[in-house]
UniProtKB/Swiss-Prot annotation:
Name of the featured protein: Complement component C8 beta chain
GO molecular function: protein-containing complex binding
Residue numbers covered by the propeptide annotation in the UniProt entry: 32-53
Organism of provenance: Rattus norvegicus (Rat)
Domain TSP type-1: 63-116, 544-587
Length: 589
């Protein structure tokens, strides 16, 4: 029987043969539409012609490679188990063999060492979760234990809350761990269904909410006007640095993996939205295009967590208690995979609606248009309902120019225009209906109101402040908390290196590599296909530089340590852009 990788290799060979015979087309060559990366652009130079050959040879498959097994740990006295692990040396890529087997092993063992894992509880010890709760919480109608054992064998229930109340919007994600290396929400780490017997009603928009014990504040924000901030970019390089990288980038950390202040929570590159946005905009790198970016931010609530004595979710509590005291990366890595790298301490809830008009520079010059004209008409048309005559009076743009610009935006799918594409990214309040309208045209006042109403009841976390997960490990809940905390810190450093996409080989033609578990994939700019983005009809395009992985930190010397990286993954070619950011870092130690 063939393995999955062998099937992929056979498929890759078939595709190459098909390309050689001229039977492989890009989406749109004969009216075909790809599943998700459908483009609204009608640019003759990029879309109308079809590829007849592969410019680059498909890279050879790269097989996944794991390290050799670590030594077995000593037998853990509390778990009566010992552990060993491997780690990822090289991810699979280009249909290479996958690492589809376990990267850790656990086996039972015997030891004479005593286990002292219990933390003294002055209250009631919950039967299954092991949580310690105050005895005054017994028989109060709430599931304070998480396993209902505090409500068992009650002669009478003394309910504090006489009426049902709702949970705060987005409270599930706020209680979850978050992997800030991948921008994903993981398992629950805080119990925001625990109220410590309190019944504190909180009315927001005529809805009665019950405030969880862990939450210090959840403050609604007054819904303001839907105003777009418009920014003009004369080149793709400026647009990518100021817009795309911020919308899809991962968080950067100071020493200790702490975030400084509130930071914007970006869209995952691996998500449908992230792939779509990157593919649609990156196709215009190194073209004569100008970019008009519009952005509207709607804040509906501010959230803040208590600073101490938090009630942990019982699933997270039990997982941390089951960790071995002797460091084993495999076990601690699994904790980070399942519960994330950080937890949220503050957040701004709401939505972000942004769109980008991509304009053909030559066509604009022929028609005597500037980005100021486009900005005035696109922004003004939304603000006053699209009345072109009023835009003409208010902004000093001729009525004909505004009318022509708005018509070209509307008709960009039907004919070749100076408007090459309209790319939309919506966070918060999204629905299929709203998204389908957003992708078709510039936002109207009616659409924005509909979106704003949806954001109110389905907000996204658009900004956050977070602390590393190990900060939840305290002596209140865990014996040997300092040992476990140090182990989690060490695992976090190793985990960051293991999951970084810098470990992927470069994609061709400015494709964006992403690492998913032990496999690398390429997000291709629209107009490029293939496992490495190697299939295209465009020739000799400039290749932008990308960073290699950071080196290990140097030994601490004079209270300082350093690390380096190189702009060679790939290096800039044919006039491509250099890597942005520093090539070295220095920290106190």
């Amino acid at each position: 029987m063939k393995t999955g990788a062998q099937v992929w290799r056979a498929l890759a060979k078939s595709c190459l043969l098909c390309a050689a015979l001229g039977c492989l087309h890009l989406p749109g060559a004969r009216g075909e539409k790809p599943d998700f990366f459908e483009t609204n652009a009608v640019n003759g130079s990029l879309v109308r012609s079809r590829p007849v050959r592969s410019v680059d040879v498909t890279p050879a498959p790269t097989d996944c490679q794991l390290s050799t097994w670590s030594s077995w740990t000593a037998c853990d006295p509390c778990q009566k188990k010992r552990y060993r692990h491997t780690y990822l040396l090289r991810p699979s890529q280009f249909y290479g063999e996958l690492c589809d087997f376990s990267d850790k092993e656990v086996e039972d063992c015997v030891t004479n060492r005593a286990c002292r894992s219990q933390v003294r509880c002055e209250g009631f010890v919950c039967a299954q979760t092991g949580r310690c709760v105050n005895r005054r919480l017994l028989c109060n109608g709430d599931n304070d234990c998480g396993d209902q054992s505090d409500e068992a064998n009650c002669r009478r229930i003394y309910k504090k809350c006489s009426q049902d109340m709702e949970q705060y919007w987005a409270i599930g994600n706020l209680a979850s761990g978050i992997n800030l290396f991948t921008n994903t929400f993981e398992g629950p780490v805080l119990d925001h269904r625990y109220y410590a017997g309190a019944c504190s009603p909180h009315y927001i928009l005529n809805t009665n909410f019950r405030k969880p014990y862990n939450v210090e504040s959840y403050t609604p924000q007054t819904q303001g006007k839907y105003e777009f901030a418009l920014t003009e970019y004369e080149s793709y390089f400026d647009f990518e640095h100021n817009v795309t990288e911020k919308a899809t980038s991962k968080s950067s950390f100071k020493f200790g993996f702490k975030l400084d202040g509130l930071v914007e929570f970006g869209v995952r590159k691996e998500s449908n939205e992230g792939r779509h946005y990157i593919s649609r905009t990156k196709r215009f790198s190194h073209t004569k295009s100008k970019f008009l970016h519009a952005r509207s931010v709607l804040e509906v609530a501010h959230y803040k967590l208590k600073s101490r004595q938090l009630m942990l979710h019982y699933e997270f509590l039990q997982r941390v208690k089951s960790l071995p005291l002797e460091y084993s990366y495999g076990e601690y890595r699994d904790l980070l995979r399942d519960f994330g790298t950080h937890f949220i301490t503050e957040a701004v809830l709401g939505g972000i609606y942004e769109y980008t008009l991509i304009m053909n520079k030559d066509a604009m010059e022929r028609g005597d248009y500037t980005l100021d004209h486009v900005s005035a008409c696109a922004g003004g048309g939304f603000q006053i309902g699209g009345n072109v005559y009023k835009v003409y009076l208010k902004l000093g743009v001729s009525e004909k120019k505004c009318s022509d610009i708005l018509n070209e935006i509307k008709d960009r799918n039907k004919r070749r225009t100076m408007v090459e594409d309209l790319v939309v990214l919506v966070r918060g309040g999204t629905s299929e209906y709203i998204t389908s309208l957003a992708y078709k045209d510039l936002p109207t006042a009616e659409l924005m109101k509909e979106w704003g109403d949806a954001v109110q009841y389905n907000p996204a976390i658009i900004k956050l402040k977070a602390e590393p997960l190990y900060e939840l490990v305290t002596a209140t809940d865990f014996a040997y908390s300092s040992t476990v905390k140090q182990n989690m810190k060490k695992a976090l450093e190793e985990f960051q290196m293991e999951v970084s996409s810098c470990r992927c080989a470069p994609c061709r033609n400015n494709g964006v590599p992403i690492l998913k578990e032990s496999r690398c994939e390429c997000i291709c700019p629209a107009g490029f296909q293939g496992v490495a983005c190697e299939v295209t009809n465009r020739k000799d395009i400039p290749i932008d530089g990308k960073w290699s992985c950071w080196s290990d930190w140097s030994p601490c010397s004079g209270g300082r340590k350093t690390r380096q990286r190189q702009c060679n993954n790939p290096a800039p070619q044919r006039g491509g852009s250099p890597c942005s950011g520093p090539a070295s870092e220095t920290l106190d130690c």
